[in-house]
Design a protein with these regions (language model features):
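C-terminal scaffold of the Radical SAM
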Residues: 4-6, 27-56, 61-300
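Local cysteine-cluster metal-coordination motifs and their immediate loop/turn environment
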Residues: 14-27
Length: 300
């Protein structure tokens, strides 16, 4: 009998306030009101179609983890997220200690919703801080400032979350070694259980690709990584993926499932999935990228 790997679920919410110049994810700048209730209904219909189509792979399995990414999922209300999670659980069982991560902006409006997301069932928030330098944040097209980022972390700590992550970038336009390390020191000072510390890369078809900024050279990048890695290690963080650092016991289970070649369902615009079948065959699939098509019920 085929032994199945753990099963996860990725949920994609594609809207954001504005497209960042480095972003190559499937995200769409918000224009008017986001149809969040309608989109949630389509997410559930998408899941139902997959559960029926891939029954041979999915039946008798429970969800090990879930990741709600974007875009900016925290543009959705806590009520919508609660409905989404409840409807998913009605259709596929959750494991006893399921990890449910949701990406969020550290802007004031989104951060105030953290407690509501926890009440909805979210166990882990991943915040896109990127930098604590206001000039660098502006250059990256981020809509929050350093003060809002720090405030959001304080709110996360008292929201009832089991864990939270801070996304931080280095190798930013015109960034010096000391600026990069200062960002990292400020992040460490806030004592998140998990830090994702990754280098800015220029991806095709982004604004930065069309108008490339001046970035640190390879020698400077190596110095940033070497000294930054030492800071993180000395602060008790363990590197367990290329850009992921965690305090012991706080590794992201969803990302580990990707790294360990686990299975994952995928719903939402542009979401990618991978499933193992009883005969050992492996299927990879992706969903319709644009919200217009997806909201017409064209999921594949």
């Amino acid at each position: 009998m085929q032994k199945f790997p753990p099963l996860s679920l990725y949920v994609h919410i594609p809207w954001c306030v504005q497209k960042c110049p480095y972003c190559d994810f499937n995200s769409h700048a918000q224009k008017g009101t986001i149809p969040e209730q309608e989109y949630v209904q389509h997410l559930i219909a998408d899941l139902e179609a997959d559960l029926e189509k891939y029954q041979a792979s999915i039946q008798h399995r429970s969800l090990h983890s879930m990741f709600i990414g974007g875009g900016t999922p925290s543009l959705f209300s806590a009520e919508s997220i609660k409905l989404l999670l409840a409807e998913i659980q009605r259709r596929i069982p959750f494991s006893e200690n399921i990890e449910i991560t949701m990406e969020a902006n550290p802007g004031t409006v989104e951060a105030e919703r953290f407690k509501g997301y926890v009440d909805a069932g979210v166990t882990r928030i991943s915040m896109g801080i990127q930098s604590f330098n206001d000039d660098k944040l502006q250059r990256l097209g981020r809509i929050h400032n350093a003060e809002e980022a720090t405030s959001a972390v304080s709110l996360a700590k008292v929201s009832g979350l089991k864990s939270f992550n801070l996304d931080l970038m280095h190798g930013l336009p015109n960034q010096t070694l000391e600026e990069a390390l200062d960002d990292l020191r400020q992040a460490i000072e806030l004592a998140p259980p998990h830090l994702s510390w990754y280098q800015l890369t220029i991806e095709p078809n982004t604004m930065f690709a069309y108008r490339p900024p001046t970035l640190p050279d390879d020698d400077e990048l190596w110095d940033i990584f070497e000294q930054g890695h030492q800071l993180l290690t000395e602060a008790g963080y363990q590197q367990y993926e290329t850009s992921a650092y965690a305090k012991p016991g706080f590794q992201c289970q969803h990302n580990l499932n990707y790294w360990r070649f686990g299975d994952y369902l995928a719903i939402g615009c542009g979401a990618h999935g991978k499933l193992t079948f009883p005969d050992g065959d492996i299927l990879r699939f992706s969903k319709t990228k644009h919200p217009k098509g997806y909201l017409r019920g064209e999921y594949l």
